[in-house]
């Protein structure tokens, strides 16, 4: 599958019914303002799914459009309005007494459809036990439905249902080896580097100070055996002191920090929580984790070193590995050590105060005695502060003993990082204190826990929130403040900007006081990992802040989806804020060895690059994972988790093979092949489209964390004071959403599948599409009278004659005037009164006939017979492998004819007449746009709206090949042997001539007077002339389409030919090797034979 196809598919999924549902309602509202007035809601509380909300409304007076929202995700579907009669038949058959009003009956129909995986079908008589829902379950559901109307809830849903877009996001990239400097300099990784981009953007995260970069020159003895021995001793000493350092840090946490925290929570507390947080900063545990990982790798590399025999070449390899190890781990240190070093300035005051507490002194002495380490608390808490300069001392000596080259340069970069760490706290402390002091003046009620030495200010932006209150829309000014770990929301006192004031705090000292216009009220904050920050796909200046979990802080729990607007003048500022947010998420990972970014058009993709070993230890994983490997047997399934998509790039020969894996019920290509030169663009396009797919607010993912939907529904209903009552106990049939919700914890490590978009594993081997369609036909055949079907066929044949009466159809699609609309209504009424015939149509122009024909299809036929091209019919087509309707292929006609035989005879006859009319219209319409418009309207009338372009393609194919499709089923063509081909051809020609002679009417020469032509002959000639022009137009269109499709086929053919050529070349090489081996064996055999004959001759002589 090519990238363009993937892009269109992903964009379609991102706004399709299953993933963005409410766009259907918004479009319907624009077409029909009465839609909002008829909008009704119903709720019930399911024991497994929790609270379920369903909204529905009538469309065109005969179709119910419904949208359901539950923990399983969103679902949108349409129901033919006579569905209520099915409910009555079901209730009568099962002796269920339902006292349901009209509105409740419609709600029951929507709930019934929602609880069934397949399209609802009912059975009467003895087979009622095969019904898709159990009688007791249905009875309890329909008895507990609560129906109500709410215009404010309708508007709230419309505002939330909009799909979202993203231009910046984070991806985890996994490689076979560590992504260090040697990896970046390896030319064999050039194609991977084009994908993950540049790492220069993150150099500012190391926060270079004003001090010059260190420069070193190797000593004269560098590289000699004495220098190598001395260097080994330094490395051993450094490793031993690192082990002691890690042991002391663990002693500090286990024997001091944890016991004192436990005592602080009881009545025996020795120090308060504030003092404990000062002495034992939150980043202390992170330092232990980082240094333990550094020590493990340090020891692993040193274990390969032979201390007795000095192999200079092997030592150089180990030395380079050590240098790269130091650089990568010291870079990780630079993210966390500065916070500890900065807070160390307050250690002395707290220890001085604690030394005056006798019980604390007693506790300290007892711990020091039990530990038998002879190290006090004051020394332990200063260990990280003293350790950083010691790294620098060790490395200074190691660099002098290292020869100039890549290894020495890597050591120099490591020293540079360490010295920057030592100088960071002074710079950070001044800026941080200035910013937080200013924030406390601007936001007087700022939460105390927001001020922390481990928190860095990153960016802020002024926005406006749309808020619905008492049915009126209010605009409230807000400001979003972004820190490295949290996002803060404040409400401004006025419309004046405060973002510029906050940003200026980085460079200038805060004022003692600010005016009222420059102040704000603190609303709340949330963790960056707990929210999604995305932009609208429709309005460029709209921001969505979506809370992922119901355990969010109170404000974000009450409003899980916040919609903000930004001034168009600040769109660039908004882009910068998006990038800052994604960069903060990327920098907050614990294990990546390298950070990089790549741009494509307006999109920025941040890559966290790992080795496989590093990623197994990563706790904060992204929802998109790329595995870049040369190993065809890589175990990609261990990287799968709930809610993510894994893309594997496997390099083979001159191409890259892509495969996609996910537990989500989304449609993804199974495999793709990309040439090396197209790798970057293709890869980034795949990532962008997949991220769009995942970022819809109502995307059905994270099924093990089902808080968002419950949180959202509770908010929507409680905000409008909607009454709720329900009781439900039975579990429903095996395929119902209740069973799906139960099975969420049984499959795929608590991963699940959505009702709309996937099939349960337990059902994968029990699908029989033909059986489903046949079951649904039993009800249709039972309830649809044969007489009404025959009458409908007569009406359609009359329409066909009416269209043929008019020779010029260029005005067919002209809009109707008011007078013509009245005439069209009268014509439609005559159809319903059964006073309709072909002669009646001859008095109307083509545009009135066509408008009446469309109304007849969408209103009368749909109400009488339902959707003729049902969802099960289209799904059956989708299950046929290699079925391509874009070409006039015999197998496509065969499969279509075979599946059509499952339809009822009446429906088949109706479809045959409809597509006969469509075929005639498409052949006679002069313009391609007119043909496309007619095809789309037929697709809307005959197929469910959820299938979109697929339904249009199907209708187009059925119309142009109606004469071949609507007939008896033909077997697929079988290969014919050359011996019989000529005989079969002669038989076919003779048979065709016999049939033609038999069907040819007798023609008697008719005398025609000179200069006179009969009107019938003239009309027949005129009709044939226009028919010929239409066929020429059709052939022109097919020629244009072939010009587009043939290059794709040509490229695919060249690719296949290339593979065949490679295979043939490989086969020739193997055969040549076999031939050479045979020749060599023969020569050896002949030489032995000659030697043997020579021996015998000598013996004889």
UniProtKB/Swiss-Prot annotation:
Q: Which of the residues bear the PTM Phosphoserine?
A: 736, 977
Q: Which UniProt keywords apply?
A: Cell cycle, Cell division, Cytoplasm, Cytoskeleton, Guanine-nucleotide releasing factor, Phosphoprotein, Septation
Q: What does this gene product do? A: Has a role in the control of cell polarity and cytokinesis. Involved in bipolar growth and septum formation.
Give the record's GO CC terms: cell division site; cytoplasm; cytosol; medial cortical node; mitotic actomyosin contractile ring; mitotic actomyosin contractile ring, intermediate layer; mitotic spindle pole body
User: What GO molecular function annotations does the UniProt record carry, in alphabetical order?
Assistant: guanyl-nucleotide exchange factor activity
Q: Which GO BP annotation is one of this protein's?
A: division septum assembly
The listed locations are: Cytoplasm, Cytoskeleton, Microtubule organizing center, Spindle pole body
- The residue ranges flagged as biased composition, category Low complexity, are 210-219
Q: Where is this region: Disordered?
A: 203-222
Please state every residue range assigned to the domain named DH. Answer: 230-428
Task: Please report the organism this UniProt entry assigns to the protein.
Answer: Schizosaccharomyces pombe (strain 972 / ATCC 24843) (Fission yeast)
| UniProt keyword Transmembrane helix present | no
What protein does this entry describe? Answer: Rho guanine nucleotide exchange factor gef2
Query: InterPro entries in the record, alphabetically?
Result: DBL_dom_sf, DH_dom, FYVE_RhoGEF_PH, GDS_CDC24_CS, Gef2/Nod1_dom
Please name the PROSITE patterns in this protein's record. Answer: DH_1, DH_2
Write the gene name.
Answer: gef2
């Amino acid at each position: 599958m090519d990238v363009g196809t993937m892009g269109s598919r992903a964009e379609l999924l991102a706004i399709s019914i299953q993933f963005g549902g409410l766009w259907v309602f918004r479009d319907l509202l624009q077409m029909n303002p009465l839609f909002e007035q008829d909008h009704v809601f119903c709720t019930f509380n399911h024991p497994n799914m929790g609270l379920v909300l369903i909204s529905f409304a009538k469309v065109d007076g005969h179709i119910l459009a419904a949208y359901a929202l539950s923990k399983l995700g969103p679902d949108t579907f349409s129901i033919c309005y006579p569905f209520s009669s099915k409910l009555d038949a079901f209730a009568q058959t099962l002796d269920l007494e339902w006292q349901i009003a009209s509105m409740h009956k419609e709600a029951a129909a929507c709930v019934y459809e929602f609880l069934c995986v397949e399209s609802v079908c009912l059975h009467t008589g003895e087979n009622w036990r095969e019904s898709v829902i159990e009688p007791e379950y249905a009875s309890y559901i329909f008895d507990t439905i609560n129906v109500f109307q709410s215009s404010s809830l309708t508007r709230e849903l419309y505002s939330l249902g909009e799909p979202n877009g993203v231009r910046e996001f984070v991806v985890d990239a996994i490689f076979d080896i560590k992504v260090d400097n040697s990896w970046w300099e390896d030319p064999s990784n050039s194609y991977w580097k084009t994908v993950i981009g540049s790492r220069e953007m993150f150099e500012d995260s190391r926060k270079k100070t004003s001090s010059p970069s260190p420069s070193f020159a190797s000593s004269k003895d560098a590289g000699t055996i004495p220098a190598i021995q001395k260097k080994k001793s330094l490395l051993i000493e450094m490793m031993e002191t690192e082990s002691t350092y890690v042991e002391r840090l663990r002693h500090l946490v286990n024997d001091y920090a944890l016991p004192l925290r436990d005592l602080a929570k009881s009545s025996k507390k020795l120090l308060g929580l504030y003092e404990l947080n000062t002495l034992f900063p939150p980043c202390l545990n992170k330092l232990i984790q980082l240094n333990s990982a550094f020590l493990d790798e340090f020891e692993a590399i040193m274990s390969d070193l032979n201390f007795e025999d000095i192999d200079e070449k092997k030592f150089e390899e180990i030395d380079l590995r050590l240098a790269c190890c130091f650089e990568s781990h010291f870079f990780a240190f630079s993210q966390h050590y500065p916070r500890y070093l900065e807070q160390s300035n307050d250690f002395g005051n707290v220890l001085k105060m604690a030394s005056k507490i006798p019980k604390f002194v007693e506790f300290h002495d007892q711990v020091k005695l039990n530990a038998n380490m002879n190290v006090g608390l004051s020394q332990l808490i200063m260990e990280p502060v003293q350790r950083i300069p010691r790294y620098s001392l060790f490395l200074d000596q190691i660099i002098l003993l290292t020869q100039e080259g890549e290894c020495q340069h890597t050591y120099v970069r490591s020293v540079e990082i360490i010295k920057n760490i030592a100088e960071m706290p002074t710079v950070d402390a001044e800026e941080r204190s200035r910013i937080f002091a200013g924030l406390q003046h601007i936001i007087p009620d700022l939460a105390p826990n927001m001020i922390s030495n481990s928190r860095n200010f990153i960016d802020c932006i002024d926005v406006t929130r749309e808020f619905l209150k008492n049915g009126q829309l209010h605009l409230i000014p807000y400001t979003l403040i972004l820190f490295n770990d949290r996002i803060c929301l404040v409400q401004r006192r006025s419309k004046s900007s405060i973002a510029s004031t906050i940003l200026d705090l980085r460079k200038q000292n805060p004022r003692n006081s600010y005016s009222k216009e420059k102040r704000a009220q603190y609303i709340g904050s949330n963790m960056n990992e707990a929210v999604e920050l995305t932009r609208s796909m429709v309005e460029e200046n709209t921001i969505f802040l979506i809370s992922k979990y119901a355990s969010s802080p109170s404000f974000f729990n009450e409003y899980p989806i916040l919609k903000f607007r930004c001034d168009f003048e600040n769109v660039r500022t908004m882009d910068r804020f998006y990038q800052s947010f994604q960069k903060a998420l990327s920098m907050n990972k614990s294990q990546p060895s390298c950070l990089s970014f790549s741009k494509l058009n307006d999109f920025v993709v941040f890559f966290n690059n790992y080795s496989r070993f590093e990623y197994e230890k990563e706790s904060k994983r992204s929802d998109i994972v790329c595995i870049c490997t040369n190993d065809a047997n890589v175990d990609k399934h261990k990287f799968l988790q709930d809610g993510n998509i894994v893309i594997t790039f496997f390099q083979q020969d001159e191409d890259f093979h892509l495969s996609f894996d996910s537990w989500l019920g989304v449609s993804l290509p199974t495999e793709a092949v990309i040439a090396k030169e197209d790798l970057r663009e293709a890869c980034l396009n795949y990532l962008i489209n997949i991220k769009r797919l995942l970022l819809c607010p109502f995307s059905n993912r994270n099924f093990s964390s089902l808080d968002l939907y419950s949180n959202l529904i509770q908010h929507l209903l409680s905000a409008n004071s909607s009454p709720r009552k329900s009781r439900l106990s039975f579990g429903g049939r095996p395929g119902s959403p209740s069973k799906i919700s139960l099975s969420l914890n049984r499959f795929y490590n608590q991963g699940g599948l959505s009702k709309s978009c996937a099939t349960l594993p337990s059902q994968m081997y029990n699908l029989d599409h033909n059986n489903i369609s046949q079951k649904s036909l039993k009800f249709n055949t039972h309830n649809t009278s044969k007489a009404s079907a025959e009458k409908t066929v007569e009406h359609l044949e009359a329409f066909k004659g009416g269209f043929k009466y008019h020779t010029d159809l260029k005005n067919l699609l002209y809009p109707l005037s008011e007078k013509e609309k009245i005439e069209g209504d009268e014509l439609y009424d005559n159809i319903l009164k059964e006073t309709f015939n072909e002669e009646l149509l001859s008095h109307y122009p083509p545009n009135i006939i066509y408008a009446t024909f469309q109304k007849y299809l969408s209103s009368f036929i749909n109400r009488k017979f339902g959707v003729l091209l049902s969802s099960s019919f289209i799904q059956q087509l989708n299950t046929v492998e290699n079925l391509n309707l874009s070409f006039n292929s015999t197998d496509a006609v065969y499969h279509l004819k075979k599946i059509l035989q499952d339809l009822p005879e009446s429906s088949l006859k109706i479809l045959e007449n409809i597509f006969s009319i469509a075929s005639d219209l498409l052949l006679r319409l002069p313009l391609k746009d007119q043909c496309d418009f007619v095809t789309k309207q037929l697709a809307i009338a005959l197929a469910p709206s959820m299938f979109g372009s697929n339904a249009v393609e199907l209708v187009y194919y059925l119309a142009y090949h109606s004469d071949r499709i609507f007939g008896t089923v033909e077997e697929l063509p079988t290969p014919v042997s050359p011996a019989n081909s000529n005989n079969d051809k002669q038989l076919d020609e003779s048979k065709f001539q016999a049939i033609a002679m038999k069907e040819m009417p007798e023609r008697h020469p008719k005398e025609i007077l000179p200069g006179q032509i009969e009107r019938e002959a003239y009309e027949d000639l005129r009709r044939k002339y226009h028919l010929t022009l239409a066929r020429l137009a059709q052939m022109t269109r097919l020629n244009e389409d072939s010009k587009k499709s043939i290059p794709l086929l040509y490229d695919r053919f060249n690719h296949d030919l290339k593979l065949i050529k490679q295979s043939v070349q490989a086969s020739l090489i193997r055969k040549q090797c076999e031939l050479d081996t045979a020749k060599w064996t023969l020569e050896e055999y002949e030489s032995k034979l000659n030697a043997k004959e020579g021996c015998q001759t000598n013996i004889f002589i």
